Amino acid sequence: MSTAAPLEQETVPLSRTSAGREVPPARERARGWRSAEDPIIGWTGAVAVTLLAFFLRVWRLGTPHQFSFDETYYAKDAWSLLNNGYVRAYVDEADRTILNGQTTGLWKDEPSMIVHPEVGKWLIALGEKAFGMDPFGWRVAAAVVGSLMVLLMCRFVRRVTGSTALGLVGGLLLSFDGLHLVLSRLGLLDIFLAFFLLCGVHCIVADRAWFRDRLDRRTSASSSGWGARVLWRPWLVAAGVSFGLAIGTKWTALYPLAAFGVLVWLWSAGARRSHGVRWATAKSALLDGVPAFFSLVLVALVVYVASWGGWLAHAAEYEQSTLSDSQFTQYGGGKQWPTATEPDATGLGEVTQSLRSLAHYHHDVYMFHAHFLNDSTHIYASKPSGWLLMNRPVGVDAQLDIQPGTQGCEAPPGSNCLRQVLLLGNPILWWGGCLALLFAVAMWAGARDWRFGVAVVGVASTWLPWLLYDDRPIFIFYAICCLPFVVLAITLTMGKLIGSSRAPSPRRTAGVTVAGSFFVLVLVNFAWFWPIWTDVLLTHAEWVNRIWFKRWI
């Protein structure tokens, strides 16, 4: 009686590329390109790009010396959080009082009905704590976070592409965009939202490689038909923290959280399929989807609720305001919160009571966003369908009719000078990005290149939901959350144009020429629009040369 030799696990290539080369097995593909290029060079270059971005953002940061656009809400809310632990209503003429140097005695007794979460305002408060309640103080946090976002962009693109050079190009492109520059120089919330979203997506992309590596190490011939179990995924927990902070800045982060959560499941299923697991999509929904939900969504929920700590600690003030102040009931149909008339609880009951009050508060704020702005108008409102084409910028600040001989104006007789801060993206970057996104859709759908899918899903989840709300005043600078993924699409397209081979060839020469020319055009465009992004004095003729379309006025 003979005994058959034990079967050895055999690795079989899954398919062939369009060039006829065999696709490497899962074990080799899981290794990625972690050691492909020198990390010291990568980090040194990224830090250098970040320092350049910081210089551009902190230069004359305190001008204009006034509350610009919605800074009047967020900067003052942040100051109240810092001094009171929650947002209190301000006295009349508070803006003028603050700009005159008086920063105390500004508040009324009752809390204020704020309509955005508090994470971004706490970050603004850190700048005010460090540098004072003045324009530099309430803008410096945005400058720091905007610069850190450039660093994150360098590392994100490098992680996706495996190229240090493309990573640095991605960081520079982000740095040279007008929306990013201006929002990094204002005390608004959107730059913080974009930063945390990019951080969350970066962690999810890192989890993809980490999960495949762990799956490869643990999968063997003796594994069950489900494949190895990988329950602890630290990068997903980090992503959950980042998304929690993003939602704690603005609720719109819920859409990319949902979209990339689905992508996590599909990527996990694809990893299992590459190891021969049958019905991988269905099995992964249970084996990977459930743990990922806890790591990503529930962690985000915990972080989000914790970000309301100041509000929860002063829930009693809000509860009492529903009894005496109509601003807390107008959006909820005039109904008082049930917690307002309940006896004050203690211990765990007090926590529960405060959370219930927070839930009622969220209901009223949601009603405000969903219904009470529908009939409003704003001179700078724009349709989201045209955001990626830079259809309608936002005038943040303007000093018009500066006469010759004043403030350094050297306009010819009969003309004048002006200063302006315009929330407008770099047109060359965004228009080129639209073409790159079309290419990304083709590469994701046709070549099934997951990297292009990150760009497509990122733009879709941060842009398309706004089409549901185009009957209310919304603004082009909300597209700042799309920008990192537009830049990713551009850098991936550049990589395809240049090719992976370093050997000289006509194709590589043409690709480098096209990609390099585009980068130079973006840089030249950045220099050209710099004055209308940074409040620089211009003659009227110089200003007109930069306003390419009537709808930009």
Language model region names:
Residues 61-99, 302-392, 538, 542-547:
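Aromatic-rich transmembrane-lumenal/periplasmic boundary elements in polytopic membrane proteins
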Residues 12, 160-161, 200-235, 264-272:
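Membrane-interface transmembrane helices that cradle and orient dolichyl/undecaprenyl
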Residues 67-68, 142, 182-192, 249-252:
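Short acidic/glycine- and proline-prone juxtamembrane loop motifs at membrane-interface regions
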Residues 33, 43, 48-49, 153-176, ...:
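Transmembrane-helix signature of polytopic, membrane-embedded enzymes
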Residues 1-56, 287-300, 505-515:
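Start-transfer (signal-anchor) and selected internal transmembrane alpha helices
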Residues 140-161, 199, 436-439:
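Transmembrane-helix motifs of polytopic, lipid-linked glycan transferases
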Residues 2-7, 227-235, 268-269, 279-282, ...:
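Transmembrane helical bundles and short interhelical boundary loops of multi-pass, membrane-embedded
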Residues 53, 170-175, 182, 243, ...:
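Short helix- or helix-capping micro-motifs
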